[in-house]
Every structure is written in structure tokens, then in C-alpha cells.
Amino acid sequence: MSVSDSLFERAKQLMPGGVNSPVRAFRSVGGAPFFVKAARGATLVTADDQELIDFVCTWGPAIHGHNHPRIKAAIAEALEHGTSFGTPNPYEVEMAELIVRFFPSIQKVRMCNSGTEATMSAIRLARGFTKRSKIIKFAGCYHGHSDSLLIKAGSGALTHGHPDSAGVPISFAQETVVVTYNDRAALEAAFAANVGQIACVIIEPYCGNVGFIMPDAGYLQAVRELCTREGAVLIFDEVMTGFRQARGGVQELENITPDLTCLGKIIGGGLPVGAFGGRTYLMDLLAPLGPVYQAGTLSGNPLAMAAGIAALKLLDEENPYARLDQLGRQLRDAVLAAAKTKGLPVQVPQRGSMFSIFFTPQPVRDYASALAGDAKLFGRFFHTCLANGVYLAPSAYEAAFLSTAHEGAAIDRACEVLASAINEL
């Protein structure tokens, strides 16, 4: 029995499914998960000493690769002063300054501990501001595991065939209106059916939790216009895309100004973190200034702030986005070329350092077209790649990520492995 298998057997006796987040259990692709004991650059080292080129990047945060010396040093320096204070600290002020600098839509920001906390709190703030209760989300988009948002959710909920989670009261579900991504008419119809009742629209501007899906030209602008017309707060969930697609997120690339923005992942440098921010008139409704309550024991944790500050400063200094897009295109082109030779229908939506591989003949532009892909074939593809040293997300419905550490031999080897895996299908 391998070390990973032994650990998994022990874990299953102690944790539900043997994991602390469902997608890690490999239920979508089959087999047992491996355990990781170390990571550096673009490489994971398993408990059995197998080295894997990693395209999960801890589900997005590791844009600089694993164990970056600048981030390690920042954490070590902060650790010299303590792990947590329960008071304001200088690091959270510097982090807020960086976020406000790079996101013009954000005038004030509140730190929290996860993307789920960020989206949950942003929705509460939108409800407090509008004095309305209903929200609109998009089928397949995942915004964390709070009750209001586990309605036709993506990510692990979609992977495991339970887009509507047990334990969510019907009364909660009735407050969430679900529409199709990339369908303006559906959004207009949702507003028309709920006149004066919609507090907010929450959207992944580039979807990453039903696989990677891009918006149609003009779609995000249409969403912005409809929210303005209907008096609803527009929330961009950029937990995944913020600082990954651009320093100012998708809103910078698409020239859209949301009312509230949710952040996470990269801003923690690999440590637990979340944040949400927006215009002063909205943010000042939060306690202690206003009536909308939000709090957290470890919010603004100095270690997470120090790691995140180092990560953001590296992005500012290196501006790696064009380079990351080139790496993404190289990988995409290798897969498409192999699929063409094989005669296999494959879609590889890619922008910057995010991509997905769907085994389907039709372009993927929403939840339904993502589900039309061949998930079983993806599972075979995944395991062939894994056996040859390349780790993709263990689900057909998750985005993959690149880092600056994937340059050179890592990307060349990955292209070879992915092309070969296509040929073996």
C-alpha cells in the first residue's frame, strides 16, 4: 500500500470522506487522492515522493508558484512578532491600501477569512442597503457554501451531482433567483418577475467553478446596465480572478464598475483570507459605523496579510500577465493540435493563467453546455496525465491555473504529457 493510500485510509476514519473539501476526494474522476508533503515552484511532492507539475495551484492562490522565497520571508518576519493579536495591525492597513490602489471600484475594504465569508457578507450588505431580500445568481457559478448560494452551484457541489445542497431551507432557496450565464434575456425576465425585490446580482465575471467560461462580448456591460436600471447592487465575485487575470481583476479588463467586489485566494499568498469592498456609501453601512453586522476573530490576520502583501507587491513589480497568457496559449494550442490529429472534439477556453479542457464538440458558454461535456472521458484523461506527472483539477468542472513558475521545462513537459494523454484516449 502506498503512503498516500495508507494516509487516506486513516483519514476516512476521522474526516467525512477522508477530506476537508469534497473535490479533493477524487469522486468525479475516480480513484483515491494523493497526499502532498511539500511543494516548490510548479511542482508538488507527494507522500510517496512522486513529483507532479501542478496546474491546480492550491485552487488559484499560487500565482507565483509554491514556496516563493519572498512570501516565505514575509511570513517569517511577521511570525517573529506573533501569530494573531485580536486588534488592528499595521499589515491590514497596508493590504487595504494595495487593494484600493489596484481596484478603482473599491474605496473601502473589509478583510475576512475566506471567499465564502466575503460573498456572504457582501450579499448581507446589499440587502441592508436596498432593504430587499432576493438575490440573483447564475447557474453553475459558485460563490462559497453559504445557504443562499448553494442553489445550482458550481465547484464541488456540481462535481458531486448535488447542485442543490441538503440542509438549505426552502425559504432560503426561494430568495435566490437563478438565471443562465451569458443570457441577457433571462436576466431581464428575472428582474421583470421580481420587480422591486432584487437586492443584488452576484456573478463570477469569468466563470471558474463550472470549468472556465468567458462572457459573450458586451454581456457584463448588459448586466451592469440592468442592475443600474433596477436599483440592484452588482457584486463581482473576483475571489478567483482578482489579481489573477489582471492586477485590477476582470473589471479592469472589461472596463466594468461593480458596486461591490469580493476577493480572496491570491491576496492571502496561500494563507486563509477573504475581502470585500466597494464605494464608501455602501461600506460605511457596516458595523461599527452602520447597521449591517459583520465580524471575524481572525480577520486581518497578520500572517495572512504579510503573505498577501508580498504576493501583491511581486505582481506589481513583475507584471507577469502577458507572460502567463502566453503560457496558457502554449498549453491550449498543444491540446487542440493533439485533439485535431486524434479527431477528438475538445474545447479549451483559456484567458491569461486560467483554462479548462472540455470533451465536447460545442463551445462552452454556460452551465448546460459545460454539463454536455464527457466527464467520464475527462476522468480517463486526468488519470493518464497524473500517471505521467501532470496534475490537473480532479473534476471536469473546475478551472486549471498556471503560475509564473511554469515557464521553461515545466510547460514544455506538460504540453507533451497532455498531448500524449489526448492521443491515448
UniProtKB/Swiss-Prot annotation:
Biological pathway: Porphyrin-containing compound metabolism; protoporphyrin-IX biosynthesis; 5-aminolevulinate from L-glutamyl-tRNA(Glu): step 2/2
Enzyme class of the recorded protein, top EC level: isomerase
Keywords: Cytoplasm, Isomerase, Porphyrin biosynthesis, Pyridoxal phosphate
Subcellular localization, as worded in the UniProt entry: Cytoplasm
Pfam families named among the record's database cross-references: Aminotran_3 (PF00202)
Residue spans crossing the bilayer: none
InterPro entries xref list: 4pyrrol_synth_GluAld_NH2Trfase (IPR004639), Aminotrans_3 (IPR005814), Aminotrans_3_PPA_site (IPR049704), PyrdxlP-dep_Trfase (IPR015424), PyrdxlP-dep_Trfase_major (IPR015421), PyrdxlP-dep_Trfase_small (IPR015422)
Main location (coarse class): cytoplasm
In-chain residues carrying the UniProt-annotated modification N6-(pyridoxal phosphate)lysine: 265
UniProt catalytic activity: (S)-4-amino-5-oxopentanoate = 5-aminolevulinate
GO biological process: protoporphyrinogen IX biosynthetic process
CDD domains named among the record's database cross-references: OAT_like
GO MF, any single term: pyridoxal phosphate binding
Keyword Magnesium: no
Highest taxon of source: Bacteria
E.C. code: 5.4.3.8
Cofactor: pyridoxal 5'-phosphate
Any one of the GO CC terms: cytoplasm
Subunit-level organization: Homodimer.
Entry similarity comment: Belongs to the class-III pyridoxal-phosphate-dependent aminotransferase family. HemL subfamily.
Protein name listed in UniProt: Glutamate-1-semialdehyde 2,1-aminomutase
Organism: Opitutus terrae (strain DSM 11246 / JCM 15787 / PB90-1)
Gene behind the chain: hemL
